[in-house]
Amino acid sequence: MHQSGSVSLCRSAISVLVATALYSPIALASTVEYGETVDGVVLEKDIQLVYGTANNTKINPGGEQHIKEFGVSNNTEINGGYQYIEMNGAAEYSVLNDGYQIVQMGGAANQTTLNNGVLQVYGAANDTTIKGGRLIVEKDGGAVFVAIEKGGLLEVKEGGFAFAVDQKAGGAIKTTTRAMEVFGTNRLGQFDIKNGIANNMLLENGGSLRVEENDFAYNTTVDSGGLLEVMDGGTVTGVDKKAGGKLIVSTNALEVSGPNSKGQFSIKDGVSKNYELDDGSGLIVMEDTQAIDTILDKHATMQSLGKDTGTKVQANAVYDLGRSYQNGSITYSSKAISENMVINNGRANVWAGTMVNVSVRGNDGILEVMKPQINYAPAMLVGKVVVSEGASFRTHGAVDTSKADVSLENSVWTIIADITTTNQNTLLNLANLAMSDANVIMMDEPVTRSSVTASAENFITLTTNTLSGNGNFYMRTDMANHQSDQLNVTGQATGDFKIFVTDTGASPAAGDSLTLVTTGGGDAAFTLGNAGGVVDIGTYEYTLLDNGNHSWSLAENRAQITPSTTDVLNMAAAQPLVFDAELDTVRERLGSVKGVSYDTAMWSSAINTRNNVTTDAGAGFEQTLTGLTLGIDSRFSREESSTIRGLIFGYSHSDIGFDRGGKGNIDSYTLGAYAGWEHQNGAYVDGVVKVDRFANTIHGKMSNGATAFGDYNSNGAGAHVESGFRWVDGLWSVRPYLAFTGFTTDGQDYTLSNGMRADVGNTRILRAEAGTAVSYHMDLQNGTTLEPWLKAAVRQEYADSNQVKVNDDGKFNNDVAGTSGVYQAGIRSSFTPTLSGHLSVSYGNGAGVESPWNTQAGVVWTF
């Protein structure tokens, strides 16, 4: 071997090793020297440099084979790796199942079969069969004797050539008129491309032809999956576009023509006539050109910067007026004009220019007028705009509709405000508006408003000369800042219309009203369409008031607070009930140890309680509480008395259903201590102190069904003292008693998601109770004891000033003061000398609170 060859070999090997080391965790290189032959090598995550001959090689993913100068590979199977054929190298009878075969300049690939993968040619490819995958011929590369079967693709780029191509049915060719030369046969006969002229091309199944400026294409067939793209200045005649084929062209093409369902279409001298587009085909109408009687169907597109007349947009096709997107660049034109368009389940976007007389129909029909573009006049609608049969009409910002007669029939017009930082409202003017079972929706631009404060909200004023028919208007208000959407009819208004207003939690000043509708006359009737004819605005509900002077205003109804207000009151009123339910477990424990001798005990009690509550402030809810209390206590005996001292820890969860919709939750964590003293004559005194941590969550419902969410934490503390006398007569005992209970929460401020502000003051219990308990003790033969018992009590609640402030509308008082009765029954049982249990149930009613049940079940272990 010559020294120069050795140096070249070393340099090549080192280059490959360095490159692969950078991109592969494991890269092993082997060399087949000049004159050497190897057979059956499998390459996986390694590299082979071939200067000699490599037969029957398999290249799997991660493997590479480099056929160097005068190197040869025979019968190589490529399954995902790379084969590089360098200058004067050759690959014979290769099969590509996946991966790449790259033929560099001066290299050759002969008798190659592509099942999948890519054969990329900068040199030469001879006798290639493409069953799948792609053969790409780059500039100065060439392919001779190519058979393209169904699913295969031959791509010839500018400056490349392909001779003797056999394009079988379903085979695809992708190329340009700037290819050096391409010729062969297809199922329609012979085809060729040379010197910028393409003849008899068949485009299908992913094939395409790009006709460049000043180039020509004659008698092109665009079948399903094919694409013919005609650049500005290109000429195409005899186009036969089949179903599923695509044709993309602009009116700046010198000429495009061919047959269609109307006979013949043409684009010539800047005028398109009778052009039918479907299956993703596209037409661009350039400035100072025009399109006449164009039909867009089946996802076709049309972009017009010029003038079009009689265009039909249907079957999910898309039309753009005053805007085009080409080669990554967007162009606008205020000179664009569209006249007499019909949209039938298609979409038209108006970016700039003027649209004169348009009809939109069908559930998928959309006419959307975009907000004014920078440095361009607002888009204009002129003449009749008829929207019907479930179609949608949308306008963004201050577009020019002052000369439009809008007719809405069973359809929706969405007016979208242009959000700005200058707080300029959107003003929209019409010539006339007619409605029939239609909706007009005024709304914000659907973008994140994090940088726009509530005071900068952009409202809409819709002004029309006349209004007739029937339908609904959906408006936004900001009563607190005296702003809203408005409808202004300068002339006559006739018909029946409903106004829908969005609920909000923020309150205006007391007595404020806000005018939403004004007319110049006529017998039109406007009513509030919200559920119940009311809208939630802060603390109180509002109604739509006919002022008697052809104007209608939102006015406050102080007789009824909003559901959000009741939600705030409900949560405040529920917390004392949580404290009380947890307290009952400790009272049961203290009652069960009267006259019982033990040293130390651990106990637990599970509770389930239901409370139905109404307050004078208007709150109303149903509370279901479940919880568990754990305790430990010890008994200390003296000469004539005994004492008990203990600690408790508990948790409870309350599900609260609000009477006017929505729900809340309270998770309570409690810690406390208790003590009792009992004299041998039966006199006793019990005491409990307890603190709570409340985690409160609100999922309220406004009148319109929207959610008002909020959460906050609060704390509570309370004490209970009970004194009585226990008489024992044989197995019977009677225990009359008096008790006093006090409880308070700390004040908390929070805000709901609808903007309502709540300032909850101290919520308190101050209660006196008088009652009597009766029990009977039974000893069973198996050693078990039973003690059924009954208790009845009368409670008097004195706390009548539990105040809650909502927004700035004064304070509401959750007053549950009054008299109530409580009736209880239970049973205690000892199973063993150290294990006992109890069950109880109670009913209470009075002072705005009904407790259908309060159940307890517990066990006690003494030791």
Swiss-Prot record:
Keyword flag Transmembrane: yes
Question: In the UniProt record, which is one GO cellular component term?
Answer: cell outer membrane
Q: How does it sit in the membrane?
A: Peripheral membrane protein
- Where does the record locate the signal sequence feature? 1-29
What the entry lists under InterPro entries is as follows: AIDA, Autotransporte_beta, Autotransporte_beta_dom_sf, Autotransporter_adhesion, Autotransporter_pectin_lyase_C, OM_autotransptr_brl_dom, Pectin_lyase_fold/virulence, Pertactin_central
Sorted alphabetically, the keyword list is: Cell outer membrane, Membrane, Signal, Transmembrane, Transmembrane beta strand
User: Where is it located?
Assistant: Cell outer membrane
- Chief location of this protein within or outside the cell: membrane
Where does the Autotransporter domain lie?
A: 595-863
Q: What is this protein called?
A: Putative uncharacterized outer membrane protein YejO
